[in-house]
C-alpha cells in the first residue's frame, strides 16, 4: 500500500445540526439521527435496504454499498461492525499504521489498516457515545422487552374495550332466557340448604350386568328415575318460555327437546357440583356421589358429568350464563329430522351472539374465557350422545316398569 495524503471522503460530516427527517429528502448524509430512529432503521434482515437510502448509496467510510444509518452515519454492515467492536472492546489505543496514518480506506483496503479505518470512521462523524457496552446493551434489551410487553398489555386492554356488549334487543333476549331458567330451576340459589343426600345404603342391592359390561344397582336406578320426570318437565317448561322456540313447528320442538334434554339436565347437575362433599345435586334435590350415579345406570356418563362439574367450578357461571348455555344447546340445528333448519340456525346464532356479548359485559378474568366455555357446550353434546348409547343397553337389561313413561318418550329413538 502506498502512503497517501489524508484526503477525506467528500461525504464527511459537516456537523450534527439537525435530526434525520422523516422523508428521504436530506441536505447532508451524516446529519444527526435520534436513538429511536436509529433503532427503528437498523438492519436486521440480510439484504434489506431502508427506503430512505438512495439507490446504491455508498458507505461514507469505505465506499461499499451502505445498508443504513449506523452510529449517526450512513455505512455498510462491515464498517458498522468494525466501529462497534473497536469501541466495545476498547481496541483503538492498540491500533497502528505502517504509513503514518495516511492510508486510503475503500472496500478493498479497509481491512489492511485498522487505525486509518477507525480514524476515517471518526472523521466522517460516527459517534462513539452511541456504542453501548455490555451492561448498557443488556439494559437496552430489557427496556425493549418491557416496552414490547407493555404494548401487548395495552393492545389487550384496547381489544377488551372494543369487544361489543349486548344491544337492547339482545338484553331482552338475555332477560327472557334468564327468567325462563330461574322459573324452571328447582330450589334456586338455596339448593345446598334444601338438598337431600342419597343414603350410602343405596348400592348394596344386587347388581344387574348390562350388555356393555357395566353393572346396574336397581335400587339406585329406581331412585334416579323417580326424579327424572320432574327434571324433564322443567327442561320442557324452560324451552316453552323462549319465544323463538314457541314459534317453531311442534315437530321441530319435539326433535330439539329430545336431543337436548339430557344435555341440559347434565348442565344443571354439573353447575351444582359440591367439591366439599364431592356430590352432584340432581334436579336440585338429590345429592349423589360419583359411584352412586355410575352404579345407578349412567356408567361412564357419570364420570363425564362429574368431571364437567369440577371444570365448570372455575368459570363461576351466573344464572344468565347457565340459561344462555341451555338456549344454545336447545337450538342446535344439527339435530336430524327437523323442518325449519334455517330458522333454528338463526335462533342459535342470536343466542350465541347475545351469549358472547354478555360474556364481554361480565369481564371474566380467565384468559380466553369465551372459547373455553364453548368447549363445555361441546362436552355436553358428547354427554348427550353417550347417554343415548347407554340408554339402549339399559332398556334391554332393566325391568321396563322402572322406566317412567316420560323418560321413555324423551330418550327412545334418539340418534346414537
Swiss-Prot record:
Compartment annotation: Nucleus
Q: Does the keyword Kinase apply?
A: no
Q: Outline the residue ranges of the record's NR C4-type zinc fingers.
A: 59-79, 97-121
Classify the source by domain of life. Eukaryota
Tell me, what is an example of a GO biological process annotation in this record? Answer: thyroid hormone receptor signaling pathway
InterPro entries linked to this entry: NHR-like_dom_sf, Nucl_hrmn_rcpt_lig-bd, Nuclear_hormone_rcpt_NR1, Nuclear_hrmn_rcpt, ThyrH_rcpt, Znf_hrmn_rcpt, Znf_NHR/GATA
DNA-binding region(s), chain positions = 59-126
Q: Which CDD domains match?
A: NR_DBD_TR (cd06961), NR_LBD_TR (cd06935)
**Chain residue ranges for the region called Disordered:** 1-37
Q: Where is this region: Modulating?
A: 1-58
* Gene Ontology MF terms: nuclear receptor activity; RNA polymerase II cis-regulatory region sequence-specific DNA binding; zinc ion binding
Q: Which SUPFAM superfamilies match?
A: Glucocorticoid receptor-like (DNA-binding domain), Nuclear receptor ligand-binding domain
Q: Which UniProt keywords apply?
A: DNA-binding, Metal-binding, Nucleus, Receptor, Transcription, Transcription regulation, Zinc, Zinc-finger
Q: Where is the composition biased (Basic and acidic residues)?
A: 15-24
In this chain, composition skew of type Polar residues spans 1-13
Domain NR LBD: start-end pairs: 169-413
Q: Which Pfam families match?
A: Hormone_recep (PF00104), zf-C4 (PF00105)
CC per GO annotation: RNA polymerase II transcription regulator complex
Q: Does the record bear Nucleus in its keywords?
A: yes
**What this chain does, per the record?**
High affinity receptor for triiodothyronine.
Q: Which family does it belong to?
A: Belongs to the nuclear hormone receptor family. NR1 subfamily.
Record remark on domains: Composed of three domains: a modulating N-terminal domain, a DNA-binding domain and a C-terminal ligand-binding domain.
What protein name does the entry list?
Thyroid hormone receptor alpha-A
Q: Which gene encodes it?
A: thra1
Amino acid at each position: 500500500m502506498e502512503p497517501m495524503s489524508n484526503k477525506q471522503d467528500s461525504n464527511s460530516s459537516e456537523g450534527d445540526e439537525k435530526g434525520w427527517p422523516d422523508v428521504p429528502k436530506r441536505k447532508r448524509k451524516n446529519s444527526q439521527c435520534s436513538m429511536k430512529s436509529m433503532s427503528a432503521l437498523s438492519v436486521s434482515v440480510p439484504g434489506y435496504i431502508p427506503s430512505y437510502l438512495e439507490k446504491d448509496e455508498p458507505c461514507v467510510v469505505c465506499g461499499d454499498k451502505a445498508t443504513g444509518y449506523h452510529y449517526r452515519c450512513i455505512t455498510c454492515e462491515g464498517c458498522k461492525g468494525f466501529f462497534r467492536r473497536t469501541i466495545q472492546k476498547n481496541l483503538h489505543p492498540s491500533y497502528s499504521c505502517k504509513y503514518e496514518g495516511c492510508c486510503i480506506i475503500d472496500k478493498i483496503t479497509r481491512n489492511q489498516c485498522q487505525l486509518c479505518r477507525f480514524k476515517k470512521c471518526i472523521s466522517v462523524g460516527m459517534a462513539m457515545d452511541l456504542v453501548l457496552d455490555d451492561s448498557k446493551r443488556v439494559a437496552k434489551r430489557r427496556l425493549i422487552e418491557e416496552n414490547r410487553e407493555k404494548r401487548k398489555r395495552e393492545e389487550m386492554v384496547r381489544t377488551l374495550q372494543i369487544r361489543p356488549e349486548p344491544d337492547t334487543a339482545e338484553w331482552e333476549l338475555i332477560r327472557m332466557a334468564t327468567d325462563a331458567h330461574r322459573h324452571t330451576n328447582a330450589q334456586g340459589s338455596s339448593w345446598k340448604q334444601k338438598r337431600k343426600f342419597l343414603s350410602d345404603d343405596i348400592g348394596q342391592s344386587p347388581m344387574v350386568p348390562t350388555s356393555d359390561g357395566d353393572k346396574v344397582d336397581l335400587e339406585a336406578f329406581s331412585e334416579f328415575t323417580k326424579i327424572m320426570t320432574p327434571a324433564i318437565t322443567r327442561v320442557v317448561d324452560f324451552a316453552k318460555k323462549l319465544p323463538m322456540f314457541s314459534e317453531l313447528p311442534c315437530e321441530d320442538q319435539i326433535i330439539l327437546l329430545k336431543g337436548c334434554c339430557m344435555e341440559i339436565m347434565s348442565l344443571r347437575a354439573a353447575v351444582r357440583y359440591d367439591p366439599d362433599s364431592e356430590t352432584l345435586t340432581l334436579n336440585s334435590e338429590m345429592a349423589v356421589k360419583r359411584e352412586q350415579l355410575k352404579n345407578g345406570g349412567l356408567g361412564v356418563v357419570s364420570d363425564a358429568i362429574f368431571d364437567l362439574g369440577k371444570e365448570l367450578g372455575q368459570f363461576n357461571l351466573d344464572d344468565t350464563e347457565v340459561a344462555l348455555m341451555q338456549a344454545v344447546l336447545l337450538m342446535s340445528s344439527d339435530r336430524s329430522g327437523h323442518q325449519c333448519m334455517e330458522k333454528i340456525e338463526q335462533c342459535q346464532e342470536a343466542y350465541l351472539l347475545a351469549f358472547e356479548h354478555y360474556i364481554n359485559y361480565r369481564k371474566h378474568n380467565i384468559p380466553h374465557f369465551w372459547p373455553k366455555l364453548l368447549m363445555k357446550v361441546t362436552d355436553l353434546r358428547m354427554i348427550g350422545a353417550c347417554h343415548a348409547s347407554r340408554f339402549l343397553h339399559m332398556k334391554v337389561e332393566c325391568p321396563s316398569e322402572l322406566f317412567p313413561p316420560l323418560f321413555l318418550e324423551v330418550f327412545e329413538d334418539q340418534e346414537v
